[in-house]
Amino acid sequence: RDLRMSRGLGDVYKRQTYADRYTGLAKLVQSDDSPDCFPFEICNYPYSVYQNLFQSLDGVIDFTTDDWADYKEAIDKFNWGGKNYCPIMSLTPTSYLWYRKSVVEEAGLDDPWELYEKGEWTWSTFMEMARKFSDPENGKYVLDGYNPENNFVCTTGTPLVSLEGGKLVSHMNDANIEKCLDMLRSFDNTQEQLRYPRDTENSWTPSYNEWADGNTLFFEDGSWRYEETWRKFKKKNKWEDDEVNFVPFPQMDGADKYYQSMKQDSIMLVAGAKNIDGYKAWIYSNLVASNDPEIAKVGREQSKEEYDWSDTLLDRIEMMNDPKTFSGVFDFKNGIGQDIASTENQDNPVEQLTKGPYMTGESYTSFRAQYQGQIDARLAELNKTVE
């Protein structure tokens, strides 16, 4: 509260349910009662700008200064129509592959983190490990989570939809994306049965218990999964500090760089916002805080004391979050309209491109043939608005 007041932001905030957040924001904008800030979400960008919910930061923030040097390359990838809207203040991998050390050892597998450190954590080593561990007749599966397929696609270095020169560009015909989704197709229970069958066994929900019981080798999720779930299993089962581990998604064989899907910490300036100076001050306060070593030190100690993080895992996270560790990939495929690209379900054209092969075993090319025309038409429609 005090920081908001000192920065001129006042002490008023609007509470909205998650499901109604954009509907509620639109009503506030239309009634000339816009809030100043709104959290950025790539799943609705740049469509949210097309809907006139946000305003450009050109003339508000100068992204050419040294303040933004670490994130300038990423910020440029979010340019829409020649304008900047996203003040990225930090980046972190969208998801990790979580695993248990003892499960890997008992299966006679190499430790994934050690493979990563040696530069040997690739698609091919991942698949070798997957096929060795998999034993569906005895309930042993390799991978679980809500969105592993999207993270894998980004390791090609090419998103399905990018922003280039301020416009949306389709890469649905990219050979490496096709290769990636052909690999993921093998995970379905109609193929090699490598993924946990959450659709038939758990009402489409990933199973934390199966991972904790050692029946699922990898679980795709963000760092918050440790705080919300894994640390509780650790305490209950009296695991050692080095039992819970994570590794980034494997590098594509032969890739020129190590690409990874990256999540952005960014706050948008709402259309019609009255307190531009307050917004700007808030952004710079967040930027300074996110890169302040003393604040990071306090946060680290809090993570250890309150959430049982180990120094080993925290060191790993710090390395993962360093802008120099990975080449960040940002996929704007879901930001072209909820009617054809909602992340809330997989039964829409955009989600079918990736979840279709992974969850049904049907080929990526069959889904592409079915939906490419509709998606390309939407991209052209949106691009026309910024010509």
What function would you assign to each model-found segment?
Residues 2-13:
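Single conserved hydrophobic/aromatic residue that forms the stacking wall/gate
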Residues 16-22, 40-94, 247:
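Hinge/lid segment of periplasmic solute-binding proteins
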Residues 22-34, 46, 51, 104, ...:
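Short helices/loops that flank or line small-molecule/ion binding pockets
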Residues 37-38, 79-91, 95-97, 105, ...:
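Extracytoplasmic/periplasmic solute-binding protein
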Residues 58-70, 115-118, 159-180, 236, ...:
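Short, solvent-exposed loop/beta-turn-alpha elements that line the ligand-binding surface or hinge
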Residues 127-130, 165-203:
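Glycine-centered hinge/linker elements that transmit conformational signals in sensory
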Residues 234-307:
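Extracytoplasmic/periplasmic substrate-recognition and gating elements
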Residues 271-280, 288-387:
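Conserved C-terminal helix/tail region of periplasmic/extracytoplasmic solute-binding proteins
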